[in-house]
């Protein structure tokens, strides 16, 4: 258990950050699932719209440091490859 006042404050801060990170990670997964569902339905317009929203979310989270920028690039590339196969 924390002994000093600053250590107690740090515990509170880390709990807040953890909850925020869990929420943001969950939101990110939801956006990715929406794109995958649209791709599986073979709905191009819905997939492109969902991809656009997912891309914004991924970029935002990578800037904030929730995920690494290379992982963000990999994820966007992987999903866009699937969409382009659907278009062609």
Curated annotation (Swiss-Prot):
A single Pfam family, by name? Ribosomal_S20p
Gene3D superfamilies, alphabetically?
Ribosomal protein S20
The GO terms describing molecular function are: small ribosomal subunit rRNA binding; structural constituent of ribosome
One Gene Ontology cellular component term attached to this UniProt record is: small ribosomal subunit
Q: Which GO terms describe its biological process?
A: translation
Listed A to Z, the keywords are:
Ribonucleoprotein, Ribosomal protein, RNA-binding, rRNA-binding
Organism domain of life: Bacteria
Key word rRNA-binding present? yes
- InterPro entries tied to this protein: Ribosomal_bS20 (IPR002583), Ribosomal_bS20_sf (IPR036510)
Q: What does this protein do?
A: Binds directly to 16S ribosomal RNA.
Q: Which family does it belong to?
A: Belongs to the bacterial ribosomal protein bS20 family.
Protein name, as recorded: Small ribosomal subunit protein bS20
**Gene of this entry:** rpsT
